[in-house]
Amino acid sequence: MKIDGLRRLKTKNLVIILLLSVPFVCFGQTKYFEISQNSDIYNAVLRELELNYVDSLPHKKMTETAINSMLKLLDPYTVFIPKSDKNALTMMTTGMYGGIGAIIMQKDGEIVIAEPHEGMPAQRSGLKAGDILVQINGVKLKGKSVSEASSKLRGIPGTEVRLKVKRPGEKKTFEKVVVREAIKIEPVSYYGTLSDSIGYISFREFTAKSANSFKNALSELIQQHHINKLIIDLRDNGGGLVNEAIEIASLFVPKRSLIVSLKGKIKEANKVYKTVSEPLYPEMPLLILVNEESASASEILAGALQDMDRAVIVGKRTFGKGLVQNVRMLPHESYLKVTTAKYYTPSGRCLQAINYTGDRKKTPDNLTSEFKTLHGRTVRDGGGITPDTTLTDDEKINISYYLFTKNIIFDYATQYAASHPTIATPDTFRLSDEEYQQFVDYVIDRDFTYQLESNKYLQDLRKMIRIEGYEASTDSILNQLTDLLKPDIQKDLQLFRKDITFMLESEIVKRYYFQKGEAEYRLRGDKWVKDALKIIKDRDKMTAILRP
Protein backbone atom coordinates (compact mmCIF):
# COMPACT_ATOMS: atom_id res chain seq x y z
CA MET A 1 0.00 0.00 0.00
CA LYS A 2 2.78 2.42 0.85
CA ILE A 3 4.54 1.67 -2.41
CA ASP A 4 1.31 2.28 -4.37
CA GLY A 5 0.72 5.46 -2.38
CA LEU A 6 4.20 6.71 -3.18
CA ARG A 7 3.69 5.84 -6.82
CA ARG A 8 0.40 7.75 -6.86
CA LEU A 9 2.06 10.71 -5.13
CA LYS A 10 4.96 10.68 -7.62
CA THR A 11 2.51 10.45 -10.49
CA LYS A 12 0.42 13.29 -9.04
CA ASN A 13 3.50 15.47 -8.55
CA LEU A 14 4.70 14.64 -12.06
CA VAL A 15 1.32 15.71 -13.48
CA ILE A 16 1.45 18.96 -11.50
CA ILE A 17 5.01 19.65 -12.71
CA LEU A 18 4.01 18.91 -16.30
CA LEU A 19 0.91 21.08 -16.04
CA LEU A 20 2.97 23.93 -14.64
CA SER A 21 5.51 23.51 -17.43
CA VAL A 22 2.99 23.47 -20.28
CA PRO A 23 2.22 27.22 -20.30
CA PHE A 24 5.92 28.07 -20.57
CA VAL A 25 6.51 25.57 -23.37
CA CYS A 26 3.32 26.53 -25.19
CA PHE A 27 3.92 30.25 -24.81
CA GLY A 28 6.82 30.07 -27.28
CA GLN A 29 4.97 27.68 -29.55
CA THR A 30 1.47 29.16 -29.50
CA LYS A 31 1.88 31.37 -32.54
CA TYR A 32 3.41 28.52 -34.55
CA PHE A 33 0.58 26.24 -33.47
CA GLU A 34 -1.97 28.86 -34.55
CA ILE A 35 -0.27 29.21 -37.94
CA SER A 36 -0.30 25.43 -38.41
CA GLN A 37 -3.89 25.13 -37.22
CA ASN A 38 -5.18 27.90 -39.50
CA SER A 39 -3.21 26.53 -42.46
CA ASP A 40 -4.85 23.15 -41.86
CA ILE A 41 -8.29 24.78 -41.79
CA TYR A 42 -7.59 26.75 -44.98
CA ASN A 43 -6.33 23.66 -46.82
CA ALA A 44 -9.30 21.64 -45.57
CA VAL A 45 -11.71 24.26 -46.92
CA LEU A 46 -9.97 24.13 -50.30
CA ARG A 47 -10.18 20.32 -50.35
CA GLU A 48 -13.87 20.33 -49.48
CA LEU A 49 -14.62 22.94 -52.12
CA GLU A 50 -12.65 21.03 -54.75
CA LEU A 51 -14.47 17.80 -53.93
CA ASN A 52 -17.99 19.11 -53.42
CA TYR A 53 -18.54 22.54 -55.03
CA VAL A 54 -20.94 22.28 -57.95
CA ASP A 55 -18.82 24.26 -60.45
CA SER A 56 -15.11 24.34 -61.26
CA LEU A 57 -13.04 26.59 -59.01
CA PRO A 58 -10.92 29.60 -60.06
CA HIS A 59 -7.96 28.46 -57.94
CA LYS A 60 -5.56 31.27 -58.85
CA LYS A 61 -8.12 33.99 -58.25
CA MET A 62 -9.26 32.41 -54.98
CA THR A 63 -5.71 32.18 -53.65
CA GLU A 64 -4.78 35.74 -54.62
CA THR A 65 -8.05 37.05 -53.13
CA ALA A 66 -7.37 35.19 -49.87
CA ILE A 67 -3.80 36.51 -49.69
CA ASN A 68 -4.81 40.09 -50.49
CA SER A 69 -7.66 40.01 -47.95
CA MET A 70 -5.22 38.75 -45.31
CA LEU A 71 -2.69 41.50 -46.07
CA LYS A 72 -5.37 44.21 -45.92
CA LEU A 73 -5.53 43.54 -42.17
CA LEU A 74 -1.94 44.79 -41.85
CA ASP A 75 -0.92 47.97 -43.67
CA PRO A 76 -1.36 49.27 -47.23
CA TYR A 77 2.34 48.78 -48.03
CA THR A 78 2.53 45.04 -47.38
CA VAL A 79 1.38 43.56 -50.68
CA PHE A 80 1.53 40.34 -52.67
CA ILE A 81 3.06 40.67 -56.14
CA PRO A 82 2.14 37.78 -58.45
CA LYS A 83 4.26 36.78 -61.43
CA SER A 84 1.92 38.71 -63.72
CA ASP A 85 2.82 41.96 -61.91
CA LYS A 86 6.57 41.40 -61.96
CA ASN A 87 6.99 44.37 -64.30
CA ALA A 88 5.30 46.59 -61.72
CA LEU A 89 7.92 45.53 -59.16
CA THR A 90 10.74 46.42 -61.55
CA MET A 91 9.11 49.78 -62.24
CA MET A 92 8.70 50.40 -58.50
CA THR A 93 12.36 49.85 -57.65
CA THR A 94 14.22 50.96 -60.78
CA GLY A 95 11.84 53.35 -62.50
CA MET A 96 12.26 51.24 -65.65
CA TYR A 97 9.85 49.20 -67.75
CA GLY A 98 9.64 47.82 -71.28
CA GLY A 99 7.20 49.83 -73.36
CA ILE A 100 6.64 52.67 -75.80
CA GLY A 101 7.07 55.58 -73.37
CA ALA A 102 3.65 57.22 -73.20
CA ILE A 103 1.05 58.07 -70.57
CA ILE A 104 -2.42 56.89 -71.58
CA MET A 105 -5.88 57.67 -70.21
CA GLN A 106 -9.47 56.61 -70.78
CA LYS A 107 -11.68 59.23 -72.38
CA ASP A 108 -15.26 58.68 -73.53
CA GLY A 109 -14.71 54.91 -73.46
CA GLU A 110 -11.57 55.11 -75.61
CA ILE A 111 -7.87 54.82 -74.81
CA VAL A 112 -6.12 58.10 -75.56
CA ILE A 113 -2.47 59.11 -75.43
CA ALA A 114 -2.34 61.77 -72.72
CA GLU A 115 1.37 62.45 -73.11
CA PRO A 116 4.23 60.87 -75.05
CA HIS A 117 7.54 61.07 -73.18
CA GLU A 118 10.17 63.14 -74.92
CA GLY A 119 12.70 61.08 -76.89
CA MET A 120 10.87 57.80 -76.26
CA PRO A 121 9.59 55.37 -78.95
CA ALA A 122 6.04 56.77 -78.96
CA GLN A 123 7.22 60.33 -79.56
CA ARG A 124 9.88 59.33 -82.07
CA SER A 125 7.33 57.36 -84.08
CA GLY A 126 5.13 60.45 -84.42
CA LEU A 127 2.42 59.66 -81.87
CA LYS A 128 0.90 62.75 -80.27
CA ALA A 129 -1.16 63.67 -77.23
CA GLY A 130 -4.82 63.26 -78.14
CA ASP A 131 -4.27 60.30 -80.48
CA ILE A 132 -6.85 57.55 -79.94
CA LEU A 133 -5.50 54.00 -79.77
CA VAL A 134 -8.07 51.93 -81.65
CA GLN A 135 -6.22 48.60 -81.59
CA ILE A 136 -3.07 47.10 -80.08
CA ASN A 137 -1.77 44.07 -81.99
CA GLY A 138 -5.22 43.56 -83.49
CA VAL A 139 -7.08 43.74 -80.17
CA LYS A 140 -9.81 46.40 -80.11
CA LEU A 141 -9.55 48.80 -77.17
CA LYS A 142 -13.02 50.32 -77.10
CA GLY A 143 -14.29 49.93 -73.53
CA LYS A 144 -10.98 48.58 -72.22
CA SER A 145 -9.47 49.94 -69.01
CA VAL A 146 -6.19 51.82 -68.83
CA SER A 147 -4.55 48.89 -67.02
CA GLU A 148 -5.68 46.46 -69.73
CA ALA A 149 -4.31 48.68 -72.49
CA SER A 150 -1.11 49.36 -70.57
CA SER A 151 -0.41 45.63 -70.14
CA LYS A 152 -0.65 45.21 -73.92
CA LEU A 153 1.69 48.13 -74.62
CA ARG A 154 4.35 46.87 -72.23
CA GLY A 155 6.63 43.98 -73.06
CA ILE A 156 10.19 42.86 -73.68
CA PRO A 157 12.45 45.63 -75.05
CA GLY A 158 13.17 45.07 -78.74
CA THR A 159 9.78 43.54 -79.53
CA GLU A 160 7.27 45.26 -81.81
CA VAL A 161 3.81 46.53 -80.97
CA ARG A 162 1.39 47.27 -83.82
CA LEU A 163 -1.00 50.15 -83.21
CA LYS A 164 -4.08 51.32 -85.10
CA VAL A 165 -4.52 55.03 -84.37
CA LYS A 166 -7.26 57.62 -84.91
CA ARG A 167 -6.11 61.24 -84.84
CA PRO A 168 -8.69 63.93 -83.92
CA GLY A 169 -9.63 65.99 -86.98
CA GLU A 170 -8.68 63.22 -89.41
CA LYS A 171 -11.17 60.82 -90.97
CA LYS A 172 -8.96 57.81 -91.59
CA THR A 173 -7.12 55.66 -89.09
CA PHE A 174 -3.45 54.85 -89.59
CA GLU A 175 -1.04 52.21 -88.33
CA LYS A 176 2.20 52.55 -86.43
CA VAL A 177 4.70 49.83 -85.63
CA VAL A 178 6.62 50.85 -82.52
CA VAL A 179 9.60 48.96 -81.11
CA ARG A 180 9.49 48.68 -77.33
CA GLU A 181 12.46 49.95 -75.34
CA ALA A 182 13.58 49.93 -71.72
CA ILE A 183 11.82 53.08 -70.53
CA LYS A 184 13.48 54.95 -67.68
CA ILE A 185 11.40 57.59 -65.94
CA GLU A 186 13.68 60.53 -65.21
CA PRO A 187 13.65 61.20 -61.43
CA VAL A 188 14.61 64.86 -61.93
CA SER A 189 11.53 66.26 -63.65
CA TYR A 190 13.06 69.74 -64.01
CA TYR A 191 16.04 71.77 -62.89
CA GLY A 192 17.08 75.33 -63.58
CA THR A 193 17.73 78.71 -62.02
CA LEU A 194 15.13 80.89 -60.33
CA SER A 195 17.44 83.90 -60.09
CA ASP A 196 21.10 84.62 -60.72
CA SER A 197 22.34 82.57 -57.78
CA ILE A 198 19.47 80.27 -56.77
CA GLY A 199 19.06 76.80 -58.26
CA TYR A 200 15.92 74.68 -58.32
CA ILE A 201 15.61 70.88 -58.65
CA SER A 202 12.25 69.14 -58.85
CA PHE A 203 12.83 65.56 -57.70
CA ARG A 204 9.97 63.13 -58.31
CA GLU A 205 11.08 59.70 -56.97
CA PHE A 206 13.92 57.82 -55.26
CA THR A 207 14.50 54.99 -57.74
CA ALA A 208 17.78 53.17 -58.45
CA LYS A 209 20.57 55.61 -59.39
CA SER A 210 18.25 58.60 -58.97
CA ALA A 211 20.85 60.22 -56.69
CA ASN A 212 23.21 60.31 -59.69
CA SER A 213 20.60 62.24 -61.67
CA PHE A 214 20.30 64.69 -58.78
CA LYS A 215 24.09 65.09 -58.56
CA ASN A 216 24.39 65.70 -62.30
CA ALA A 217 21.66 68.34 -62.24
CA LEU A 218 23.24 70.12 -59.27
CA SER A 219 26.72 69.95 -60.80
CA GLU A 220 25.45 71.54 -64.02
CA LEU A 221 23.67 74.30 -62.10
CA ILE A 222 26.88 75.11 -60.24
CA GLN A 223 29.29 74.88 -63.17
CA GLN A 224 27.17 76.56 -65.83
CA HIS A 225 24.96 78.90 -63.82
CA HIS A 226 27.17 79.48 -60.75
CA ILE A 227 24.37 79.00 -58.21
CA ASN A 228 25.20 79.20 -54.49
CA LYS A 229 21.76 78.41 -52.99
CA LEU A 230 19.41 75.52 -53.74
CA ILE A 231 15.68 74.78 -53.51
CA ILE A 232 14.87 71.04 -53.59
CA ASP A 233 11.25 70.38 -54.52
CA LEU A 234 10.00 67.11 -52.99
CA ARG A 235 6.30 67.87 -53.40
CA ASP A 236 4.32 64.80 -54.51
CA ASN A 237 7.45 62.65 -54.18
CA GLY A 238 6.17 59.40 -52.68
CA GLY A 239 9.64 58.11 -51.82
CA GLY A 240 11.43 54.94 -52.87
CA LEU A 241 14.88 53.59 -52.05
CA VAL A 242 16.43 54.67 -48.73
CA ASN A 243 20.01 54.48 -50.08
CA GLU A 244 19.27 57.15 -52.69
CA ALA A 245 18.04 59.57 -50.01
CA ILE A 246 21.20 58.96 -47.97
CA GLU A 247 23.41 59.56 -51.01
CA ILE A 248 21.74 62.91 -51.66
CA ALA A 249 22.01 63.91 -48.00
CA SER A 250 25.74 63.08 -48.07
CA LEU A 251 26.28 65.99 -50.47
CA PHE A 252 25.41 68.47 -47.74
CA VAL A 253 26.27 67.06 -44.29
CA PRO A 254 29.53 65.96 -42.61
CA LYS A 255 30.97 62.50 -43.21
CA ARG A 256 29.63 59.79 -40.87
CA SER A 257 26.48 61.82 -40.13
CA LEU A 258 23.54 59.68 -39.00
CA ILE A 259 20.73 59.98 -41.55
CA VAL A 260 18.23 57.31 -40.49
CA SER A 261 17.87 54.29 -38.20
CA LEU A 262 15.69 51.27 -38.94
CA LYS A 263 14.19 49.19 -36.13
CA GLY A 264 12.27 45.98 -36.78
CA LYS A 265 11.17 42.71 -35.21
CA ILE A 266 14.24 40.72 -36.22
CA LYS A 267 17.87 41.65 -35.75
CA GLU A 268 18.55 41.74 -39.49
CA ALA A 269 15.97 44.53 -39.89
CA ASN A 270 17.83 46.84 -37.49
CA LYS A 271 20.15 49.12 -39.43
CA VAL A 272 21.89 52.45 -39.03
CA TYR A 273 22.63 54.53 -42.10
CA LYS A 274 25.38 57.13 -42.02
CA THR A 275 27.04 59.15 -44.75
CA VAL A 276 30.33 57.68 -45.96
CA SER A 277 31.88 60.53 -47.93
CA GLU A 278 32.95 64.10 -47.37
CA PRO A 279 30.25 66.58 -48.41
CA LEU A 280 30.71 68.44 -51.69
CA TYR A 281 28.50 71.36 -50.64
CA PRO A 282 28.72 71.66 -46.84
CA GLU A 283 27.89 75.37 -46.71
CA MET A 284 25.29 75.73 -49.49
CA PRO A 285 22.02 77.18 -48.11
CA LEU A 286 19.19 74.69 -48.65
CA LEU A 287 15.41 74.95 -48.70
CA ILE A 288 13.16 71.92 -49.21
CA LEU A 289 9.57 72.15 -50.44
CA VAL A 290 7.21 69.42 -49.18
CA ASN A 291 3.49 68.73 -49.14
CA GLU A 292 1.03 66.12 -47.91
CA GLU A 293 2.11 63.71 -50.68
CA SER A 294 5.82 63.83 -49.75
CA ALA A 295 6.46 60.45 -48.14
CA SER A 296 8.94 57.75 -47.15
CA ALA A 297 12.41 58.51 -48.58
CA SER A 298 11.33 62.13 -49.10
CA GLU A 299 10.62 62.35 -45.38
CA ILE A 300 13.92 60.63 -44.55
CA LEU A 301 15.86 63.24 -46.53
CA ALA A 302 13.85 66.23 -45.30
CA GLY A 303 13.72 64.90 -41.72
CA ALA A 304 17.48 64.34 -41.53
CA LEU A 305 18.31 67.78 -42.90
CA GLN A 306 15.76 69.34 -40.53
CA ASP A 307 17.16 67.48 -37.51
CA MET A 308 20.68 68.63 -38.38
CA ASP A 309 19.47 72.22 -38.90
CA ARG A 310 20.91 71.95 -42.39
CA ALA A 311 17.84 72.93 -44.45
CA VAL A 312 14.71 75.01 -43.98
CA ILE A 313 11.60 72.91 -44.64
CA VAL A 314 8.74 74.83 -46.29
CA GLY A 315 5.23 73.79 -47.34
CA LYS A 316 2.63 71.52 -45.72
CA ARG A 317 2.95 68.66 -43.25
CA THR A 318 4.19 65.55 -45.01
CA PHE A 319 2.36 62.25 -45.44
CA GLY A 320 3.78 60.47 -42.41
CA LYS A 321 5.01 57.14 -43.77
CA GLY A 322 7.50 55.91 -41.21
CA LEU A 323 7.47 52.30 -42.37
CA VAL A 324 10.12 50.53 -44.43
CA GLN A 325 9.46 47.62 -46.80
CA ASN A 326 11.64 44.83 -48.17
CA VAL A 327 10.81 42.59 -51.11
CA ARG A 328 10.89 38.86 -50.32
CA MET A 329 10.93 36.22 -53.05
CA LEU A 330 8.16 33.61 -52.97
CA PRO A 331 7.72 30.40 -55.00
CA HIS A 332 6.79 30.51 -58.70
CA GLU A 333 8.30 33.97 -59.39
CA SER A 334 5.96 35.80 -57.04
CA TYR A 335 7.01 38.28 -54.36
CA LEU A 336 5.93 39.75 -51.04
CA LYS A 337 6.63 43.40 -50.33
CA VAL A 338 6.52 43.39 -46.54
CA THR A 339 6.91 46.06 -43.87
CA THR A 340 9.98 45.01 -41.88
CA ALA A 341 10.86 48.09 -39.85
CA LYS A 342 10.05 51.60 -38.75
CA TYR A 343 12.50 54.37 -39.48
CA TYR A 344 13.74 57.04 -37.10
CA THR A 345 15.32 60.38 -37.98
CA PRO A 346 18.62 61.47 -36.34
CA SER A 347 16.77 63.12 -33.44
CA GLY A 348 14.91 59.85 -32.74
CA ARG A 349 11.59 60.72 -34.35
CA CYS A 350 9.36 58.12 -35.98
CA LEU A 351 7.21 60.00 -38.46
CA GLN A 352 4.54 57.31 -38.94
CA ALA A 353 1.14 59.04 -38.90
CA ILE A 354 -1.22 56.06 -38.68
CA ASN A 355 -1.06 53.18 -36.20
CA TYR A 356 -2.16 50.23 -38.32
CA THR A 357 -2.13 47.85 -35.35
CA GLY A 358 -4.77 49.92 -33.57
CA ASP A 359 -7.77 51.91 -34.75
CA ARG A 360 -5.98 53.08 -37.93
CA LYS A 361 -6.40 56.73 -37.02
CA LYS A 362 -3.80 59.44 -37.29
CA THR A 363 -1.89 60.19 -34.12
CA PRO A 364 -3.32 63.41 -32.61
CA ASP A 365 -0.80 66.19 -32.02
CA ASN A 366 -1.35 66.13 -28.26
CA LEU A 367 -0.09 62.53 -28.13
CA THR A 368 3.14 63.17 -30.01
CA SER A 369 6.51 63.57 -28.29
CA GLU A 370 9.06 66.35 -28.46
CA PHE A 371 12.58 65.91 -29.81
CA LYS A 372 15.47 68.32 -30.28
CA THR A 373 17.42 69.18 -33.41
CA LEU A 374 21.21 69.61 -33.44
CA HIS A 375 20.94 73.23 -32.29
CA GLY A 376 18.07 72.71 -29.86
CA ARG A 377 14.98 73.42 -31.92
CA THR A 378 11.86 71.48 -30.91
CA VAL A 379 10.43 69.00 -33.42
CA ARG A 380 7.77 66.33 -32.96
CA ASP A 381 7.23 62.72 -34.02
CA GLY A 382 4.11 60.98 -35.35
CA GLY A 383 2.31 62.57 -38.25
CA GLY A 384 5.03 63.39 -40.74
CA ILE A 385 7.32 66.39 -40.86
CA THR A 386 5.92 69.72 -39.78
CA PRO A 387 7.55 72.41 -41.96
CA ASP A 388 9.55 75.23 -40.41
CA THR A 389 7.38 77.56 -42.48
CA THR A 390 3.88 76.38 -43.36
CA LEU A 391 2.24 77.38 -46.64
CA THR A 392 -1.37 76.92 -47.71
CA ASP A 393 -2.87 75.97 -51.05
CA ASP A 394 -4.92 78.52 -52.93
CA GLU A 395 -7.76 76.05 -53.28
CA LYS A 396 -10.32 76.98 -55.92
CA ILE A 397 -13.04 74.87 -57.48
CA ASN A 398 -14.27 77.24 -60.14
CA ILE A 399 -15.03 76.75 -63.82
CA SER A 400 -11.34 76.07 -64.58
CA TYR A 401 -11.52 72.87 -62.49
CA TYR A 402 -14.45 71.53 -64.52
CA LEU A 403 -12.88 72.55 -67.84
CA PHE A 404 -9.85 70.49 -66.84
CA THR A 405 -11.59 67.42 -65.40
CA LYS A 406 -14.01 67.20 -68.34
CA ASN A 407 -11.04 67.30 -70.76
CA ILE A 408 -12.19 70.51 -72.47
CA ILE A 409 -8.74 72.04 -71.94
CA PHE A 410 -7.05 68.83 -73.12
CA ASP A 411 -9.15 68.67 -76.30
CA TYR A 412 -8.59 72.33 -77.14
CA ALA A 413 -4.83 71.94 -76.67
CA THR A 414 -4.96 69.03 -79.14
CA GLN A 415 -6.79 71.22 -81.66
CA TYR A 416 -4.43 74.15 -81.03
CA ALA A 417 -1.30 72.03 -81.55
CA ALA A 418 -2.69 70.66 -84.83
CA SER A 419 -2.93 74.17 -86.29
CA HIS A 420 0.22 75.71 -84.77
CA PRO A 421 3.49 74.04 -85.86
CA THR A 422 5.52 75.94 -83.24
CA ILE A 423 5.05 78.21 -80.25
CA ALA A 424 7.29 80.47 -78.16
CA THR A 425 9.54 79.04 -75.44
CA PRO A 426 7.92 77.94 -72.14
CA ASP A 427 9.15 81.00 -70.27
CA THR A 428 7.68 83.44 -72.84
CA PHE A 429 4.59 81.70 -74.27
CA ARG A 430 1.33 83.62 -73.83
CA LEU A 431 -2.13 83.27 -75.37
CA SER A 432 -3.28 86.46 -77.06
CA ASP A 433 -6.69 88.01 -76.34
CA GLU A 434 -7.85 86.77 -79.72
CA GLU A 435 -6.68 83.23 -78.98
CA TYR A 436 -8.42 83.23 -75.61
CA GLN A 437 -11.65 84.35 -77.27
CA GLN A 438 -11.27 81.44 -79.69
CA PHE A 439 -11.13 79.14 -76.67
CA VAL A 440 -14.28 80.78 -75.23
CA ASP A 441 -16.10 80.17 -78.52
CA TYR A 442 -14.88 76.56 -78.49
CA VAL A 443 -16.30 76.01 -74.99
CA ILE A 444 -19.67 77.48 -75.94
CA ASP A 445 -19.84 75.37 -79.11
CA ARG A 446 -19.17 72.22 -77.05
CA ASP A 447 -22.35 72.86 -75.01
CA PHE A 448 -20.23 72.64 -71.88
CA THR A 449 -22.17 72.64 -68.60
CA TYR A 450 -21.27 72.19 -64.97
CA GLN A 451 -22.81 72.40 -61.54
CA LEU A 452 -21.20 74.22 -58.64
CA GLU A 453 -20.33 72.12 -55.59
CA SER A 454 -21.99 74.78 -53.42
CA ASN A 455 -25.25 74.21 -55.31
CA LYS A 456 -25.06 70.49 -54.50
CA TYR A 457 -24.66 71.31 -50.81
CA LEU A 458 -27.54 73.77 -51.07
CA GLN A 459 -29.84 71.04 -52.36
CA ASP A 460 -28.81 68.82 -49.43
CA LEU A 461 -29.56 71.73 -47.08
CA ARG A 462 -32.97 72.19 -48.69
CA LYS A 463 -33.80 68.51 -48.07
CA MET A 464 -32.78 68.75 -44.41
CA ILE A 465 -34.80 71.94 -43.90
CA ARG A 466 -37.85 70.22 -45.38
CA ILE A 467 -37.37 67.25 -43.03
CA GLU A 468 -37.11 69.62 -40.05
CA GLY A 469 -40.29 71.47 -41.08
CA TYR A 470 -38.84 74.92 -41.87
CA GLU A 471 -39.46 74.83 -45.62
CA ALA A 472 -42.16 77.52 -45.67
CA SER A 473 -40.11 80.13 -43.79
CA THR A 474 -36.89 79.57 -45.76
CA ASP A 475 -38.16 78.77 -49.26
CA SER A 476 -37.78 82.26 -50.74
CA ILE A 477 -34.23 82.68 -49.39
CA LEU A 478 -33.19 79.28 -50.73
CA ASN A 479 -34.70 80.06 -54.13
CA GLN A 480 -32.68 83.28 -54.28
CA LEU A 481 -29.52 81.37 -53.42
CA THR A 482 -30.32 78.73 -56.04
CA ASP A 483 -30.61 81.42 -58.71
CA LEU A 484 -27.37 83.06 -57.59
CA LEU A 485 -25.52 79.74 -57.74
CA LYS A 486 -26.55 78.89 -61.29
CA PRO A 487 -23.35 78.99 -63.38
CA ASP A 488 -23.14 81.74 -65.97
CA ILE A 489 -20.59 80.18 -68.33
CA GLN A 490 -19.96 83.30 -70.43
CA LYS A 491 -19.44 85.38 -67.30
CA ASP A 492 -17.32 82.75 -65.53
CA LEU A 493 -15.02 82.33 -68.54
CA GLN A 494 -14.08 85.98 -68.11
CA LEU A 495 -14.24 86.14 -64.30
CA PHE A 496 -11.80 83.24 -63.90
CA ARG A 497 -9.75 83.92 -67.02
CA LYS A 498 -6.46 83.98 -65.10
CA ASP A 499 -6.94 80.47 -63.69
CA ILE A 500 -8.22 79.10 -67.01
CA THR A 501 -5.37 80.66 -68.98
CA PHE A 502 -2.77 79.15 -66.65
CA MET A 503 -4.17 75.64 -67.13
CA LEU A 504 -4.65 76.09 -70.87
CA GLU A 505 -1.19 77.52 -71.54
CA SER A 506 0.36 74.78 -69.40
CA GLU A 507 -1.35 72.04 -71.44
CA ILE A 508 -0.40 73.69 -74.73
CA VAL A 509 3.25 74.11 -73.70
CA LYS A 510 3.39 70.40 -72.82
CA ARG A 511 2.43 69.50 -76.41
CA TYR A 512 5.63 71.12 -77.69
CA TYR A 513 8.12 70.95 -74.82
CA PHE A 514 6.86 67.90 -72.91
CA GLN A 515 7.13 67.54 -69.11
CA LYS A 516 10.23 69.69 -68.68
CA GLY A 517 8.67 72.53 -70.63
CA GLU A 518 5.46 72.28 -68.65
CA ALA A 519 7.41 72.33 -65.37
CA GLU A 520 9.36 75.40 -66.50
CA TYR A 521 6.13 77.16 -67.48
CA ARG A 522 4.34 76.28 -64.22
CA LEU A 523 7.16 77.73 -62.14
CA ARG A 524 6.05 81.18 -63.29
CA GLY A 525 2.75 80.85 -61.45
CA ASP A 526 3.88 78.68 -58.53
CA LYS A 527 3.06 80.64 -55.38
CA TRP A 528 4.98 78.24 -53.13
CA VAL A 529 8.15 78.62 -55.19
CA LYS A 530 7.79 82.40 -55.02
CA ASP A 531 7.42 82.21 -51.22
CA ALA A 532 10.41 79.85 -51.02
CA LEU A 533 12.49 82.31 -53.04
CA LYS A 534 11.72 85.12 -50.59
CA ILE A 535 12.85 82.95 -47.67
CA ILE A 536 16.09 81.62 -49.16
CA LYS A 537 17.09 85.09 -50.37
CA ASP A 538 16.75 86.43 -46.82
CA ARG A 539 19.90 85.28 -45.04
CA ASP A 540 18.76 86.65 -41.68
CA LYS A 541 15.44 84.81 -41.92
CA MET A 542 17.15 81.53 -42.80
CA THR A 543 19.47 81.93 -39.81
CA ALA A 544 16.59 82.85 -37.51
CA ILE A 545 14.75 79.66 -38.49
CA LEU A 546 17.71 77.29 -38.22
CA ARG A 547 19.39 78.84 -35.16
CA PRO A 548 16.76 80.78 -33.21
Protein language model features and the residues they cover:
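Bacterial Sec-dependent N-terminal signal peptides
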Residues: 1-33
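Cleft-lining beta-strand/loop regions that shape enzyme active-site pockets
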Residues: 28-38, 42-59, 82, 112-115, ...
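Structural motif
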Residues: 130-132
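Residue-level recognition of conserved beta-strand edge/terminus positions
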Residues: 136-137, 382
